[in-house]
From Swiss-Prot:
Protein name: Protein Ac75
Source domain of life: Viruses
Alphabetical list of InterPro entries matching this protein: AcMNPV_Ac75
Main location: virion
Task performed by this protein: Plays a role in nuclear egress of nucleocapsids and intranuclear microvesicle formation.
Entry annotated with the keyword Cytoplasm: no
Keywords noted in UniProt: Host cytoplasm, Host nucleus, Virion
Organism per entry: Autographa californica nuclear polyhedrosis virus
Subunit structure and binding partners: Interacts with protein Ac76.
Length: 133
């Protein structure tokens, strides 16, 4: 098989994998919001407060590390990778705009969920490629 064909199939597999990841993240996020966040007004309010605090840099990184350690029981993310993700989230105007819409009591659209899923998968892939030191 020629190098051109090998490269084509390699890129096809990467794209399919990426597309699948985005689809899974979007579906999971949508289900979580619709089934657990939006219906539960108390939880929704608390989550929106935390997201707002995050957007306003009111949460210390050490607290974010502890939260990630709790959620990421296999410890796949180093603090450096978490810092990368924090920076990526807070420095993307479209992400912060979308999160502010959520905080302001708006139901996120399917387009917004697609955008967030694409962004999260891209940045997680980039974070996993960083050296863990």
């Amino acid at each position: 098989m020629s190098n051109l064909m090998k490269n084509f199939f390699t890129e096809l597999v990467k794209s399919t994998t990426f597309t699948t990841k985005v689809s899974v993240v979007k579906t999971t996020l949508s289900n979580w919001l619709c089934e657990q966040v939006y219906p539960d007004k108390d939880f929704s309010l608390k989550l929106k407060r935390v997201v707002n605090m995050f957007l306003n840099n009111e949460i210390e990184n050490n607290k974010i590390y502890k939260l990630v350690e709790t959620v990421d029981s296999s410890n796949k993310l180093s603090r450096r990778q978490v810092d990368f993700l924090i920076h990526a989230l807070l420095n993307n105007v479209s992400v912060t705009f979308t999160l502010h819409r959520f905080v302001d009591d708006n139901v996120l659209t399917q387009d917004e969920l697609s955008f967030l899923a694409n962004f999260l998968v891209t940045k997680m892939d980039e974070a996993y490629q960083l050296p863990a030191y």
